[in-house]
């Protein structure tokens, strides 16, 4: 599986995808950071990640839309399905590679934390809890994005399905408070308060695993009919 992770991770930088994702995220994050810190005099690093979660909603489809759809379009999926590697390892390899890109982006945000330390005394524990929540949110997004990519060979359609799903559950609580617990963004919003909500953490992990398993099932079925 390490070979798949290595191949997929490198592919993000052989193409502009990795650079575009990291670059756009940091540019947009910098804008929100500047507004919060220099306009509103806020030194709460964790609350800036509310904006980071919004940015992630728009950018994750860039990472995931070609994960499997590109393989189908170019015909290389046949090689994956007939290779000695199991479908499970292939899917997990793609998932982990995309997650590493987000993790690298998160590490880059420590620069902003250093700037806040110069202006004030941000809470390191709360910031770390926020980063954990952000990574859990990203993993949930990535797992669904890869699932969407597995059901179509068109990258654009995969991207539209992914972002459409995110926005549907983002705005769902606006119609009724009953749906609040179904919103991934709402679940993330508790982490910047410094609280690790076990129920939300379990939901993130369960959602991620479910999407990965569904992706494996989709690819296994496609393999069985070839």
Can you annotate each of these PLM segments?
Residues 44-48, 63-81:
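Transmembrane helix boundary and interhelical loop/hinge segments in multi-pass membrane proteins
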Residues 16-36, 51-60, 164-168, 210:
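Hydrophobic alpha-helical transmembrane segments of multi-pass membrane transport/permease proteins
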Residues 94-95, 130, 162-163:
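Residue-level recognition of transmembrane alpha-helices
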Residues 29-36, 44-51, 55, 97-156:
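Secretory targeting signals
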Residues 60-64, 112, 143-144, 214-215:
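Hydrophobic/aromatic residues in alpha-helical transmembrane segments
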Residues 37-42, 46, 164-226:
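Terminal transmembrane helical anchor/hairpin motif
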Residues 1-18, 225:
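Aromatic- and glycine-rich beta-strand/loop motifs that create alpha-glucan
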């Amino acid at each position: 599986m390490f070979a798949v992770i290595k191949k997929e991770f490198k592919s993000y930088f052989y193409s502009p995808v990795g650079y575009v994702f990291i670059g756009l995220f940091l540019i947009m994050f910098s804008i929100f950071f500047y507004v919060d810190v220099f306009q509103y005099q806020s030194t709460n690093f964790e609350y800036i990640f509310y904006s980071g979660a919004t940015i992630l909603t728009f950018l994750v489809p860039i990472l995931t839309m070609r994960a499997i759809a590109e393989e189908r379009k170019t015909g290389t999926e046949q090689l994956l399905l007939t290779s000695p590697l199991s479908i499970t390892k292939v899917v997990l390899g793609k998932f982990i590679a995309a997650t590493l890109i987000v993790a690298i982006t998160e590490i880059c945000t420590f620069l902003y934390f250093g700037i806040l330390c110069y202006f004030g005394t941000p809470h390191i524990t709360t910031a770390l809890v926020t980063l954990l929540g952000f990574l859990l949110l990203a993993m949930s997004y990535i797992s669904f994005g890869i699932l969407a990519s597995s059901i179509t060979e068109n990258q654009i359609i995969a991207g539209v399905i992914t972002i459409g799903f995110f926005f549907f559950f983002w705005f769902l609580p606006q119609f009724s408070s009953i749906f609040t617990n179904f919103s991934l963004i709402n679940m993330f919003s508790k982490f910047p308060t410094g609280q690790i909500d076990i129920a939300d953490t379990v939901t993130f992990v369960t959602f991620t695993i479910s999407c990965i398993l569904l992706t494996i099932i989709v690819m296994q079925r496609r393999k069985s009919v070839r």
